[in-house]
């Protein structure tokens, strides 16, 4: 699949601007977190920056502009951002001017792209648009309703949990490295959505309507994947896992998509793979990313 020259230029401009505007915390602020190396992200500065933020060593202003954060969670470019903006216009255009969505988008001072280039009424972080489109997709497909509970594995800065709170009033149990969980809860509190999030240690192990994961489950080694299956996945009536196992499985000793699906089915989950649907964006297709769901 070849990309249009215009798309390549557009995303290249985003990368150049991002490199110029990204911030870097002072070394004294990036406290060592001591997290267990269980994933791709646990080995990167991202985990330490989240630990510092969770402990009050970093302010929220500029958090999403920090290079260590952008490398992990602000990865959606403007071409994909425009794709998700189109989905939002189809599924709920009023949300593009909603003040709660604006508060989530501007929290942490992310690099935002002009609305006329994204097809939105104002500037947005392209990553915000993906989270908003995902939350709308989950609701319109019946996975979440008002007040639903959801487990999110790999919570990032808390953006999707915040969107699910805004769109569906959902309560998210965040599952990640401890310092990342605490960082995400701080974000939810600062955006007025704190009652919609809880730490993984607060979950009682009961069944839940949905477990979701944007890439994170497929960026774990097989041992941790098995732990997450037994602890979380098998308790969910439905699951949505955006998978890039084709990129990471062999590198970190994780399962391939076929192996994951076989494990899920052996555990009683009617899981299948989709390589095309309304939520997978242009870069997902380009990189061979798919969706595992049951």
How would you name each of these model-derived features?
Residues 2-125:
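N-terminal accessory regions of S-adenosyl-L-methionine
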Residues 128-146:
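Conserved alpha-helix/loop element of class I SAM-dependent methyltransferases that forms part
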Residues 146-156:
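Conserved class I S-adenosyl-L-methionine
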Residues 157-169:
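Conserved SAM-binding loop of SAM-dependent methyltransferases across substrates and taxa
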Residues 186-206:
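S-adenosyl-L-methionine
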Residues 209-223:
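A short SAM/SAH-binding and catalytic strip from SAM-dependent methyltransferases
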Residues 220-232:
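A short, conserved alpha-helix within the catalytic core of class I
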Residues 236-248:
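Conserved beta-strand signature within the Rossmann-like core of class I S-adenosyl-L-methionine
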